[in-house]
């Protein structure tokens, strides 16, 4: 689903011309380094939450997820702001075109919100999966991707050009992140985590040999 919607946004970018396509590419290449923080936190959080849920330490899992989100926001936010500030020099690695460099810097400033949304999205999706709450992230994420990344990038691109397409990216990440945060905050994952615990305990008890008297 994501790849198809991204191809739609890429097609919308290509319609704007070679310069827009180059700017799009250079900005994404920069952001992939920023996104490593969210990706790493998401993987680590999924592993740690899975272990804590398996041990029945649900409150500790909740605290750990909140701490991971907070640290991710600080680290990703600082790095993307730094990238936007140094863009006039950094982008000269790719091109000397002043228009491309200025547009890329604009996109990087827009990406501050994008990366903050990505932190919520990746960290919380991993955490929800680890608790057994797998359907909501898939359904909510798919709806946001189609609506904002796919349809939104096409419509906003026609009206506002490349910054409009970037706003569609921002909306997609932020909406998905907000939905995952809402899901976690209202503790809708708890029934799934408790179900996993019951199944584990039942499995352990069934494999425990009876004590001979």
Feature-to-residue mapping (PLM):
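Helix-terminus/linker motif at the lipid-water interface of multi-pass membrane proteins
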Residues: 3-33, 51, 89-98, 159
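Small-residue-rich hydrophobic transmembrane alpha-helices
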Residues: 23-87, 118-140, 151
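Hydrophobic alpha-helical transmembrane segments in multi-pass integral membrane proteins
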Residues: 149-155
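Residue-level hotspots within pore-lining transmembrane alpha-helices
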Residues: 1, 5, 13, 34-38, ...
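Short alpha-helical transmembrane segments in multi-pass integral membrane proteins
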Residues: 49-114, 155-213
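Short, loop-centered acidic/histidine patches that primarily coordinate divalent metals
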Residues: 142-143, 170
């Amino acid at each position: 689903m994501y790849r198809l919607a991204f191809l739609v946004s890429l097609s919308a970018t290509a319609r704007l011309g070679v310069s827009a396509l180059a700017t799009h590419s250079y900005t994404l290449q920069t952001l992939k380094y920023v996104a490593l923080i969210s990706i790493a936190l998401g993987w680590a959080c999924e592993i740690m939450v899975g272990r804590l849920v398996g041990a029945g330490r649900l409150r500790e899992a909740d605290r750990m997820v909140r701490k991971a989100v907070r640290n991710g926001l600080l680290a990703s936010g600082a790095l993307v702001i730094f990238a936007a500030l140094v863009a006039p020099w950094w982008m000269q690695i790719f091109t000397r075109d002043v228009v491309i460099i200025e547009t890329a810097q604009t996109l990087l400033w827009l990406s501050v919100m994008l990366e903050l949304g990505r932190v919520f999205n990746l960290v919380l999706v991993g955490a929800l999966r680890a608790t057994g709450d797998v359907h909501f992230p898939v359904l909510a994420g798919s709806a946001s991707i189609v609506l904002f990344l796919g349809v939104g990038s096409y419509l906003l691109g026609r009206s506002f050009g490349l910054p409009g397409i970037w706003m569609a990216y921002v909306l997609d990440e932020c909406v998905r992140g907000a939905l995952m945060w809402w899901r976690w905050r209202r503790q809708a994952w708890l029934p799934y985590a408790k179900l996993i615990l019951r199944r584990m305990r039942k499995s352990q008890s069934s494999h425990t040999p009876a004590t001979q008297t």
